[in-house]
Amino acid sequence: PEITALVETGTVNSPVIEVNPGPCFRIAGLNLAFEGRSAEQDEIQEAMSEIGVSEGDIAIPAEIIDVERQLSQFFQNEGYAFADVSNRRVRGDREAATLNITYALDLGDRVRLGETVLPEDSETDAEYILDLQPFEQGEIYAPSKLSSYAARLNELRTFRIANVRLSDEPTGESPEGDAIHD
């Protein structure tokens, strides 16, 4: 954009700011580049159809940035617990007023839920706590499964705080080749 500031003189001096915003840029291309493991083609197509922008849309910076969150969330819901957009590359063509955007995505391993491990110093009935678990061992990870379990535990009002999370490191590998996290 071009911004010009000037003062008009006359009986009363008045400031004038003229703004020429330039051309309205549109999205010409949206791409994913995977660092390490790549997703399946059908997952990629579904992810691209669910994000909030598409080719031909007006390029609104806040929406372009929010796609990072949407992509991370989509792939986490597909079982890639540690999926994260690590970089965004934007290439613009001033003459055509278009942008090509590439999101670099690090999926990590697909995660299956392992054994639920309670704190060693827990005085609670372990069997009862495990019965509240809304998933089976070996299921594909989804953030909603862990948050649902935490909500169930908090509803008991037995604990000051109930924290449900994946182990930092995998504890095994499933027959399908997915990482198992307790």
PLM features: residue spans?
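Periplasmic polypeptide-binding modules associated with outer-membrane biogenesis and secretion
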Residues: 1-182
